[in-house]
Amino acid sequence: MNQSPSKNYFTMPNEIFSLGLDASEIAVYAYLRCLENRSTYQCWPSYTTIGNAVGRAKNTVMRYVDALAEKGLVSTEPTSVLMRSGIKKNGNLRYTIRPIREAIEIFHARQLSAVERAAERQ
């Protein structure tokens, strides 16, 4: 059994635990990290596939993906599939895992903005 060890595990940045994510957001992020192509940082799972992996409904996964995108952890873009009949259909989203540094900067900027707004109110 000569398997590449990099296919049996994935890494998670330690900073993920300091960004105020709830457990389900972390689970969705971890699943996307697990599936990502380590050269392109991209993957294409369906909402249903993600939901089955993390034990959440499709609509709930959609909300978590939106939250991860808003927090700068992932970006998404629609894809399309050309069927044999020639009909073009919507495909799964293409997820790109963003550098953790970007998410940390967004998190700190939002915290600073909240502190400034609170100071203005006083």
Regions of interest found by a model, annotated:
Residues 1-122:
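Electropositive, intrinsically flexible nucleic-acid-contacting patches
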